């Protein structure tokens, strides 16, 4: 007789899992059809189609909150574009670059060259280090000469290259002067405030498109389509599905949250050895997901937003209203910057970053009037524990060494 295995003690191993195809529960998986995004996709296709005829198009910018289907839509379009180009016997490269993982000018251009290599094997890829920026751009220019038509370049999360210490203006200006059609995707329309005049003149944002948040019904449709392929028949209670959609709608209509929630609920049902996903499993999943969501939200912050979290945390205890005033938060933020030999952004720009923190549910803001002559301000409170802020920012320092000099000394001072 064989020895018992420790994994046999886990209930989910004693029966078949509810999940039969986990890829449909992965937020990175893009199905062939996107529910409730046909109108937006057709609109973008109309803007891009002239490229197939050798025509020049204006830069395209896609705005929208997280999880609104922006990246998924442009991924679907890119897949179909490549198929059409092949059918026409043409060579028009399509490159996707996520600026969150490629924040430096060097890494973006190198990644672009790697993408171009998929369309032409004569492409030269710069080394990971060792070239000057001038050499990298010269290599890109020579690579583009291999194509008769301008390339299409998708810069996803373009706002990331305009974070402090990153010269997004140089990147965008130099790319827009080459034979390239640029498509930008961002959660932050405010990134345009960081553009200098010459960069703005090259990118007039005439072709700007907004993706709205999904509502609860739309999210339920998205989940239903995925559940058809992800789970065994009749393994999801309809009430549980609607509950997932409703919770995600409350979190800003983010489809990724809805999908993650359904996946977590399925795993919870498996752990309980249940053959059906019920509302109680969704409730347990939401508790786990909220912890994960905070970590993910903080992981997406740029250096300014990260320092702002620290400034709010430091200012809040000294306020009479249990919350920090905007002006006081700005003063603390500016002091942190000067202490680290960095020039702070203007208060107007900081308000934009505060709105981003609120959108990620990391802070709450409410207007406060102090009577005649007292003026108005916003009262700001963290919605997460101080310990969570510190731990999450320490993780960012390990992952992104360039944040260390600005954030770590301040983190250490308040531990």
For each predicted feature, which ranges?
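A short, basic N-terminal segment
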Residues: 1-57, 80, 415
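Mid-core helix/loop region of P-loop NTP-binding domains shared across ATPases and GTPases
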Residues: 2-7, 12-17, 21, 26, ...
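Walker A/P-loop nucleotide-binding motif
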Residues: 55-80
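AAA+ ATPase "lid" subdomain C-terminal helix
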Residues: 249-255, 263-276, 316-319, 337-338, ...
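Short alpha-helical segments that sit at the start of domains
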Residues: 291-323
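Terminal-proximal interaction/regulatory segments of ATP-powered molecular machines
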Residues: 319-415
